Amino acid sequence: MRRTILAAAVATLAIGVAAQAHENHKHSTNPLVDARQGGMTMLVANMAALTRASQAEEADAVAKAAFPASGVASFARSLPALFGPETKDVAGTRALPAIWDDAPGFAAQVAEFQAATAAVQAAAKAGDKAAFTESLARTKAACQSCHTAFRAEG
Protein backbone atom coordinates (compact mmCIF):
# COMPACT_ATOMS: atom_id res chain seq x y z
CA MET A 1 0.00 0.00 0.00
CA ARG A 2 2.80 2.43 0.91
CA ARG A 3 4.56 1.66 -2.38
CA THR A 4 1.38 2.37 -4.32
CA ILE A 5 0.93 5.70 -2.58
CA LEU A 6 4.59 6.57 -3.10
CA ALA A 7 4.42 5.60 -6.78
CA ALA A 8 1.29 7.72 -7.23
CA ALA A 9 2.96 10.69 -5.53
CA VAL A 10 6.07 10.38 -7.69
CA ALA A 11 3.95 10.09 -10.85
CA THR A 12 1.91 13.14 -9.87
CA LEU A 13 5.07 15.13 -9.20
CA ALA A 14 6.60 14.05 -12.52
CA ILE A 15 3.46 15.06 -14.41
CA GLY A 16 3.48 18.44 -12.66
CA VAL A 17 7.13 19.05 -13.49
CA ALA A 18 6.60 18.02 -17.11
CA ALA A 19 3.55 20.27 -17.41
CA GLN A 20 5.45 23.23 -15.98
CA ALA A 21 8.40 22.61 -18.30
CA HIS A 22 5.96 22.45 -21.21
CA GLU A 23 4.42 25.77 -20.14
CA ASN A 24 7.83 27.42 -19.83
CA HIS A 25 9.05 26.20 -23.24
CA LYS A 26 8.71 28.80 -25.95
CA HIS A 27 7.22 27.10 -28.95
CA SER A 28 7.95 28.23 -32.47
CA THR A 29 5.48 28.40 -35.31
CA ASN A 30 7.05 25.33 -36.89
CA PRO A 31 6.77 21.80 -35.47
CA LEU A 32 10.12 20.81 -36.99
CA VAL A 33 11.83 23.62 -35.11
CA ASP A 34 10.10 22.53 -31.90
CA ALA A 35 11.25 18.95 -32.52
CA ARG A 36 14.78 20.12 -33.29
CA GLN A 37 15.00 22.24 -30.14
CA GLY A 38 13.52 19.49 -27.99
CA GLY A 39 15.95 17.02 -29.54
CA MET A 40 18.88 19.29 -28.72
CA THR A 41 17.72 19.41 -25.10
CA MET A 42 17.59 15.61 -24.99
CA LEU A 43 20.97 15.46 -26.72
CA VAL A 44 22.52 17.48 -23.90
CA ALA A 45 21.07 15.09 -21.30
CA ASN A 46 22.22 12.02 -23.22
CA MET A 47 25.70 13.44 -23.78
CA ALA A 48 26.00 14.08 -20.03
CA ALA A 49 25.07 10.44 -19.37
CA LEU A 50 27.64 9.27 -21.92
CA THR A 51 30.32 11.47 -20.38
CA ARG A 52 29.59 10.04 -16.93
CA ALA A 53 29.80 6.51 -18.35
CA SER A 54 33.17 7.26 -19.95
CA GLN A 55 34.51 8.48 -16.60
CA ALA A 56 33.00 5.71 -14.48
CA GLU A 57 35.16 3.02 -12.96
CA GLU A 58 32.50 0.30 -13.02
CA ALA A 59 33.28 -2.37 -15.61
CA ASP A 60 29.76 -2.32 -17.04
CA ALA A 61 29.27 1.47 -17.12
CA VAL A 62 29.79 1.73 -20.87
CA ALA A 63 27.43 -1.13 -21.65
CA LYS A 64 24.81 0.50 -19.42
CA ALA A 65 25.13 3.63 -21.56
CA ALA A 66 23.73 1.83 -24.61
CA PHE A 67 20.33 3.51 -24.25
CA PRO A 68 21.55 7.13 -24.22
CA ALA A 69 24.04 6.22 -26.96
CA SER A 70 21.16 4.94 -29.05
CA GLY A 71 19.26 8.17 -28.43
CA VAL A 72 22.20 10.28 -29.57
CA ALA A 73 22.66 8.22 -32.74
CA SER A 74 18.94 8.31 -33.50
CA PHE A 75 18.84 12.09 -33.13
CA ALA A 76 21.89 12.40 -35.39
CA ARG A 77 20.09 10.44 -38.10
CA SER A 78 17.09 12.78 -37.84
CA LEU A 79 19.06 16.02 -38.24
CA PRO A 80 18.72 16.48 -42.02
CA ALA A 81 14.91 16.39 -41.78
CA LEU A 82 14.90 18.82 -38.84
CA PHE A 83 16.69 21.51 -40.84
CA GLY A 84 14.39 21.53 -43.85
CA PRO A 85 14.11 24.69 -45.96
CA GLU A 86 10.79 25.54 -44.32
CA THR A 87 12.66 26.09 -41.04
CA LYS A 88 15.14 28.65 -42.40
CA ASP A 89 13.22 31.80 -41.55
CA VAL A 90 11.60 30.74 -38.28
CA ALA A 91 12.30 33.30 -35.57
CA GLY A 92 13.65 32.41 -32.17
CA THR A 93 16.32 29.90 -33.12
CA ARG A 94 20.10 30.04 -33.09
CA ALA A 95 20.37 28.29 -36.44
CA LEU A 96 22.44 30.47 -38.76
CA PRO A 97 21.49 31.03 -42.41
CA ALA A 98 24.78 29.30 -43.29
CA ILE A 99 23.00 25.97 -42.69
CA TRP A 100 20.97 26.54 -45.83
CA ASP A 101 23.40 28.82 -47.68
CA ASP A 102 26.22 26.26 -47.35
CA ALA A 103 24.14 23.09 -47.54
CA PRO A 104 27.10 20.88 -48.59
CA GLY A 105 29.20 22.13 -45.67
CA PHE A 106 26.37 21.54 -43.23
CA ALA A 107 25.72 18.09 -44.70
CA ALA A 108 29.40 17.22 -44.21
CA GLN A 109 29.22 18.31 -40.56
CA VAL A 110 26.05 16.26 -40.03
CA ALA A 111 27.65 13.23 -41.71
CA GLU A 112 30.63 13.42 -39.34
CA PHE A 113 28.30 13.71 -36.35
CA GLN A 114 26.27 10.73 -37.59
CA ALA A 115 29.39 8.61 -38.05
CA ALA A 116 30.73 9.55 -34.62
CA THR A 117 27.44 8.83 -32.86
CA ALA A 118 27.08 5.50 -34.67
CA ALA A 119 30.54 4.60 -33.36
CA VAL A 120 29.53 5.59 -29.81
CA GLN A 121 26.42 3.44 -30.10
CA ALA A 122 28.40 0.43 -31.37
CA ALA A 123 31.06 0.81 -28.67
CA ALA A 124 28.44 1.06 -25.92
CA LYS A 125 26.62 -1.99 -27.23
CA ALA A 126 29.92 -3.90 -27.26
CA GLY A 127 30.93 -2.58 -23.84
CA ASP A 128 34.25 -1.42 -25.34
CA LYS A 129 35.41 1.43 -23.10
CA ALA A 130 38.42 2.43 -25.20
CA ALA A 131 36.38 2.68 -28.41
CA PHE A 132 33.56 4.36 -26.49
CA THR A 133 35.85 7.03 -25.04
CA GLU A 134 37.48 7.70 -28.42
CA SER A 135 34.19 7.91 -30.30
CA LEU A 136 32.64 10.09 -27.60
CA ALA A 137 35.53 12.55 -27.98
CA ARG A 138 34.95 12.47 -31.75
CA THR A 139 31.23 13.12 -31.19
CA LYS A 140 31.93 16.09 -28.92
CA ALA A 141 34.36 17.51 -31.48
CA ALA A 142 31.73 17.15 -34.20
CA CYS A 143 29.18 18.96 -32.02
CA GLN A 144 31.58 21.82 -31.35
CA SER A 145 32.67 22.13 -34.97
CA CYS A 146 29.10 22.28 -36.24
CA HIS A 147 27.99 24.74 -33.56
CA THR A 148 30.96 27.00 -34.30
CA ALA A 149 30.06 27.18 -37.99
CA PHE A 150 26.28 26.98 -37.94
CA ARG A 151 24.88 28.20 -34.59
CA ALA A 152 24.58 31.75 -33.32
CA GLU A 153 25.92 32.66 -29.90
CA GLY A 154 23.46 33.04 -27.11
Please name every model-derived segment.
Residues 139-150:
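The canonical Cys-X-X-Cys-His
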Residues 23-136:
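Extracytoplasmic c-type cytochrome modules immediately beyond a signal peptide or single-pass transmembrane anchor
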Residues 154:
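Short Cys/His-rich "knuckle" micro-motifs
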Residues 1-7:
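Bacterial N-terminal signal peptides that target proteins for export
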Residues 15, 137-140:
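Processing junctions and N-termini across compartments
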Residues 7-9, 19:
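Cleavable N-terminal signal peptides
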Residues 15-21:
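Sec/Tat signal peptide C-region and signal peptidase I cleavage site
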